[in-house]
Amino acid sequence: LTAREVIKKLKRAGFMFDRQAKGSHEIRYNPNTGRRTTVPNHPGIDIPKGTLRAIIREAGLTLKEFLNL
């Protein structure tokens, strides 16, 4: 999945743009759960599996929930 696809799924889960982190990373925040997650935003490049798992875990979602968004 690319960063754009991951961000779309996080938006569907209630995450909003919080702030720009260092370089090309974005902090996403969910006001309903109070959770934050960092997404590397490198256009056109797929996010590595381990990084994607960390984003999903930080978001408080299961892999199945995330993929169904």
Over which residues does each language-model region extend?
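Polyanion-binding surface elements
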Residues: 1-14
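C-terminal structural segments of small proteins and small subunits
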Residues: 4, 43-69
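Intrinsically disordered, low-complexity segments enriched in glycine/proline and serine/threonine
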Residues: 8, 23-25, 68
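Short linear sequence motifs
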Residues: 8-10, 18, 59
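A short, structured beta-strand/loop element
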Residues: 17-50
